[in-house]
């Protein structure tokens, strides 16, 4: 039972939130009790009533979580934060169980993908097949089934995406109880079997793939967490990235061209399986990855150190095996690892056992005995410290491309695109852009964006504060070249000569 201490006088927001929390918990408990009673022999009507209770509980819990923490008295904020986390777990459990019940009473129910409920992992509760009942005649049986389906569609069409995920589930668990976060699974991995997935259905966010096929040979808990790392269409295209021409060409050869005619890219023409993007911070490495995700028709995994590491012994290796197995099941696919040096730095005797095993597992899965020459998996790594990577890691990235600081032409292009994107080019001419680009030598892409933002603030600072609230945005004067001179007094290059010297040395020795 969740108990709230009584709030101080006047803390109306706290009282309202506490009451909503309590109501949601009570409704959730009632739903679970009815679920327990009807899970084996309950009628369709009873199951639909259980679904209604889960919907009501989820609605109350969702309302309870819609508040501003700053409206809560400071002495109660810690308490509310703890209860908020618990209630979010309950809301997730209610949604999962609601999906399972809708699948039980009518597995064929379909629901619009524009429902208000966001995507979630498959229901952890089991699908219980309703027991067959006798009917005096086939006509009566069919009529009863049609009536049940109509009632089920009525329940499942009022805001919850009951049929959004049609994942096969097992018959081991019966109902969902409020539970703590999932801990490391110690179950052995299933025997790995290659599954051919219809490539026309990829990527998953554009046309749903059979999740059971993707998760074949993968621990379910780990697999569902990895599928959450699939990067949706970002809206970024290669043309949006200024400069970086060599990196664009390499990515086009490895990703886009083979998709147009795979038969041409076999044997010696087979695309590389590893591309390392390195360079000073803020020069478009991650943006290029987003552009690849936006233009390719492949499943794109956006992986960071936190996605692979775990405090539980053995979990990191399981996660890496699961990542590459899902990528094989869905190939062609792309794995992007940002700040790859944080997990694959040079191995040494000082490494912890967990770290050493994780690095070894990654290298084996990337290009080892378990990999195949026919695998169409591209691994893209991004780092600004390539000299710290292990030699075995570098060997697996035959394309090592440096994204250098933008030259004057690239700076002109980036400044122009940034200002046009925000409709702020009216007060500037081409000679102004050339002047700004010529005075920003050593600036990275992110430095130039920061410079544009600072210049855009100069006209705002000229407005009297007493008139600021009544000023129309369209009446603010246009940005001038002199505003960039003012901005240059505060915005400086963020890349030091020491960093550039190290990166240049690495590029001469190992770069393409």
From Swiss-Prot:
- Region (Disordered) residue ranges read 110-182
**Coiled-coil region(s) at which residues?**
32-97
Family from the record: Belongs to the AAA ATPase family. Spastin subfamily.
Q: Where in the cell is it found?
A: Membrane; Cytoplasm, Cytoskeleton; Cytoplasm, Perinuclear region
Q: Where is this region: MTBD?
A: 115-233
Question: Which of the residues are on side Cytoplasmic?
Answer: 1-274, 295-512
Consequence of gene disruption: Slow growth, reduced brood size, abnormal oogenesis and multiple vulvae. Progressive locomotor defects, which is rescued following exposure to the drugs guanabenz, salubrinal, phenazine, or methylene blue. Lifespan is prolonged following exposure to the drugs guanabenz, salubrinal or methylene blue, but not phenazine. Increases numbers of centrosomal microtubules in early embryos. Reduced neutral lipid levels in intestinal cells.
Q: What is the effect of changing residue 285 to R?
A: Abolishes ATP-binding and enzymatic activity. Abolishes microtubule severing. Forms homohexamers
User: What EC numbers are recorded for this enzyme?
Assistant: 5.6.1.1
Query: Where is the sequence biased in composition, kind Basic and acidic residues?
Result: 137-163
Q: Which GO terms describe its biological process?
A: microtubule bundle formation; microtubule depolymerization; microtubule severing; nervous system development; nucleus localization; oogenesis; positive regulation of microtubule depolymerization; vulval development
Q: How does it assemble?
A: Homohexamer. The homohexamer is stabilized by ATP-binding. The homohexamer may adopt a ring conformation through which microtubules pass prior to being severed. Interacts with microtubules. Interacts (via N-terminus) with tubulin; the interaction is direct.
Could you tell me the keywords of this UniProt record?
ATP-binding, Coiled coil, Cytoplasm, Cytoskeleton, Isomerase, Membrane, Microtubule, Neurogenesis, Nucleotide-binding
Single GO molecular-function term? identical protein binding
Give the residue range of the signal peptide: none
Q: PROSITE patterns given for it?
A: AAA (PS00674)
Q: What is the effect of changing residue 328 to A?
A: Does not abolish microtubule severing. Disperse cytoplasmic localization
Q: Which InterPro entries match?
A: AAA+_ATPase (IPR003593), AAA_lid_3 (IPR041569), ATPase_AAA_core (IPR003959), ATPase_AAA_CS (IPR003960), MT-severing_AAA_ATPase (IPR050304), P-loop_NTPase (IPR027417)
- The main location is membrane
**What taxonomic ancestry is recorded?**
Eukaryota, Metazoa, Ecdysozoa, Nematoda, Chromadorea
Please report the name of this protein according to its UniProt entry.
Spastin homolog
Ranges lying in the membrane without crossing it: 275-294
């Amino acid at each position: 039972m969740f108990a709230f201490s009584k709030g101080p006088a006047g803390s109306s927001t706290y009282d309202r939130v506490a009451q909503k929390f309590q109501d949601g918990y009570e409704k959730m408990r009632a739903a679970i009790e009815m679920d327990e009673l009807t899970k084996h022999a309950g009628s369709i009507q009873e199951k639909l009533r259980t679904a209604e209770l889960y919907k009501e509980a989820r609605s109350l819990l969702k309302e309870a979580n819609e508040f501003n923490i700053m409206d809560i008295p400071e002495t109660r904020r810690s308490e509310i934060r703890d209860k908020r986390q618990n209630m979010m777990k309950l809301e997730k459990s209610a949604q999962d169980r609601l999906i399972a019940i809708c699948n039980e009473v009518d597995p064929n129910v379909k629901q619009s993908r524009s429902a208000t409920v966001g995507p979630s992992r498959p229901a952890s509760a089991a699908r219980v097949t309703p027991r067959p009942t006798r009917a005096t005649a086939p006509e009566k049986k069919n009529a009863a089934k049609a009536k049940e389906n109509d009632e089920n569609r009525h329940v499942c069409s009022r805001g919850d995406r009951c049929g959004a995920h049609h994942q096969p589930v097992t018959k081991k668990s019966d109902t969902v109880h409020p539970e703590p976060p999932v801990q490391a699974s110690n179950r052995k991995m299933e025997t790995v079997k290659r599954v051919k997935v219809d490539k026309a259905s990829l990527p998953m966010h554009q046309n749903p793939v059979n999740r059971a096929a993707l998760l074949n040979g993968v621990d379910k808990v780990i697999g569902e967490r990895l599928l959450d790392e699939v990067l949706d269409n970002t809206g970024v295209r290669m043309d949006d990235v200024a400069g970086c021409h060599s990196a664009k060409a390499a990515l086009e050869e490895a990703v886009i061209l083979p998709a147009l005619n795979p038969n041409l890219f076999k044997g010696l023409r087979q695309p590389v399986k590893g591309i390392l993007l390195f360079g000073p911070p803020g020069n478009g490495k991650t943006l290029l990855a987003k552009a690849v995700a936006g233009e390719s028709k492949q499943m794109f995994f956006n992986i960071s150190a936190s996605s692979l590491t775990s405090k539980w012994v053995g979990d990191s290796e399981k996660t890496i095996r699961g990542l590459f197995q899902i990528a094989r099941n869905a190939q062609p696919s792309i794995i992007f690892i940002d700040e790859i040096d944080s997990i694959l730095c040079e191995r040494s005797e000082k490494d912890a056992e967990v770290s050493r095993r994780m690095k070894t597992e990654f290298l084996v899965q990337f290009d080892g005995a378990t990999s195949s020459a026919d695998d169409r998996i591209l691994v893209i790594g991004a780092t600004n410290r390539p000299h710290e990577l292990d030699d075995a890691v570098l060997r697996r990235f035959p394309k090592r491309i440096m994204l250098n600081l933008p030259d004057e032409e690239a700076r002109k292009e980036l400044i122009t695109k940034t200002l046009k994107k925000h409709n702020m080019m009216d007060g500037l001419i081409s000679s102004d852009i050339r002047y700004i680009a010529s005075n920003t030598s050593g600036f990275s892409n992110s430095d130039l964006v920061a410079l544009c933002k600072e210049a855009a603030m100069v006209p705002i600072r000229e407005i009297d504060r007493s008139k600021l609230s009544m000023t129309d945005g369209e009446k603010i004067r246009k940005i001038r070249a002199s505003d960039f001179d003012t901005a240059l007094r505060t915005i400086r290059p963020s890349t030091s000569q020491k960093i550039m010297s190290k990166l240049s040395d690495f590029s001469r020795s190992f770069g393409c």
